[in-house]
């Protein structure tokens, strides 16, 4: 999911046509979990990602695209605790994004096939 945000802003040619439509067409609502922002902050801090000088600039860009932020809520964290432990997928950021999408009844736009491990919990599109 975080890669979808990065590609939307830096490399839109990497997005599938369906993903672009879902993100850009105003008849759809599009959200980004603040979990993704935390993941971006970590990658920036480690020098693994060069992405916007500030989160305020990022927020302005997302608002032009009509993309809204999802706060991390207690219900998302409670759901996180109930997610099945899958040995080949332990990424805490992905798991919190999955929990958020499940609680909010949202689809996840991702190319990451590991999200398919949770197909009984959330729907993914690419």
Residue ranges and their predicted role:
Residues 2-3, 40, 80, 101:
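Generic structural signal for small/hydrophobic residues in well-ordered secondary structure
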Residues 1-32, 48-60, 118-119:
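Short, well-structured N-terminal submotif of metal-dependent ribonuclease cores
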Residues 31, 70, 123-125:
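General small-molecule cofactor/ligand-binding pocket signal
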Residues 4, 36-37, 76, 97, ...:
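Alpha-helix capping/helix-boundary segments
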Residues 103, 107-109, 113-126:
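Charged phosphate-binding loop/patch that engages nucleotide di/tri-phosphates or the phosphate backbone
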Residues 52, 64-111:
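Active-site neighborhoods of divalent-metal-dependent phosphate/nucleic-acid chemistry enzymes
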Residues 1-2, 33, 73, 111:
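A secondary-structure boundary/capping signal
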């Amino acid at each position: 999911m975080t890669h979808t945000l990065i590609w939307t802003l830096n490399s839109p040619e990497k997005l599938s046509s369906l993903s672009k439509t879902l993100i850009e067409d105003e008849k759809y609502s599009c959200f980004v979990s603040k979990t993704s922002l935390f993941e971006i902050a970590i990658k920036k801090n480690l020098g693994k990602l060069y992405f916007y000088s500030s989160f305020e600039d990022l927020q302005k860009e997302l608002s032009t695209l009509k993309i809204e932020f999802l706060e991390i809520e207690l219900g998302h964290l409670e759901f996180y605790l109930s997610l099945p432990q899958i040995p080949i997928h332990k990424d805490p950021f992905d798991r919190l994004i999955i929990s958020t999408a499940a609680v909010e009844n949202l689809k996840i736009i991702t190319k990451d096939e590991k999200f398919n491990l949770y197909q009984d919990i959330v729907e993914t599109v690419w």
